[in-house]
Structures are given as C-alpha cells and as structure tokens.
C-alpha cells in the first residue's frame, strides 16, 4: 500500500516537473516602448448639484455645489517610526511614484533609470530574444 502511494506521488511530481519545464520562460529584454494606456477618452461628468430656497433654508454657499470632487494633496512626509534613527526605503531600481489629484490618468510602474544600465549590452540584455530589437 505504501509503495503504491509513493509511486503515485513520484509520478505526480514528475508530471508537475515536466509541465513546469515546458512552460515559457520570462525573459527581460530591452523593450523601450513602455506601458501604453488610454484613460477617460471622451469622458464627461455631470453632478446633481442641489439648491435649497425659501425662508430659513440652509444655504451653505461655501460647500454647496463646489465640494463634488475634493482633492487635498498631501505629499509623503519622511517621519521616522523608530525614533531618532530615520529608516527609509531607497528605491534604487524604480522611479518614485507620487500622483495626486489626477483625474482619468494612470500612473504606470516602469523600470527606473538604473534598471537600464545593462540594456544596451546585447550579450546580457537581449540574450535569447531571437534577433528582435
């Protein structure tokens, strides 16, 4: 009984290994085209701004109709969590991303400038690319 279980486990492991070996490999190549996106092309927005009239009606003219899309841009504040020793994550290979109050837009994560150091060395960057480039 135990021999059959071990044999079935070995067969299952070999099938999984063969399928993983046959899967296409992810290759990093020098692709300078970058991400492509289209956001909000031809979009329009309408708001149901209400108005109250009459005697003793609450007229909040400061907020009424003007607070439909509030945007309070607050940047990253480098505050030390541990105390006197500031610990910070330095993003060396990627770009610093900071997008605030941008409607119908995309902030795409791309490779930073330091990630492209070996891009033009063909033996390192485009190995296995198949002659494209």
From Swiss-Prot:
Signal peptide: 1-28
GO cellular component terms listed in the entry, alphabetical order: extracellular region; spore wall
Cellular localization per UniProt: Secreted, Cell wall; Spore wall
Gene deletion effect: A single rdlB mutant does not form the rodlet layer on spores; disruption can be complemented by rdlB from S.tendae or S.griseus but not by any rdlA. Decreased levels of rdlA mRNA. A double rdlA-rdlB deletion shows no effect on spore germination, growth rates, differentiation of aerial hyphae into spores or surface hydrophobicity on a number of media, but spore surface rodlets are missing and cells adhere less strongly to a polysytrene surface. In the double rdlA-rdlB mutant chaplin proteins are still correctly localized to the cell wall of aerial hyphae.
Region listing for Required for amyloid formation, in residue ranges: 45-70
Biological process, per Gene Ontology: cell adhesion
Region (Amyloid-forming): 45-57, 59-70
Protein induction: During aerial hyphae formation.
Coiled coil: none
Keywords from the UniProt entry: Amyloid, Cell adhesion, Cell wall, Secreted, Signal
Main location: secreted
Domain-related comment: The mature protein has 2 regions in the N-terminus capable of forming amyloid rods of slightly differing conformation; intact protein makes longer fibrils. Amyloid formation depends on polar residues between amino acids 45 and 70.
Function of the molecule: Forms part of the rodlet layer on the spore surface; despite their high similarity both RdlA and RdlB are required for rodlet formation. Plays a role in cell adhesion to polystyrene plates. Forms amyloid-like fibrils in vitro composed of stacked beta-sheets.
Protein family: Belongs to the rodlin family.
Record protein name field: Rodlin protein RdlB
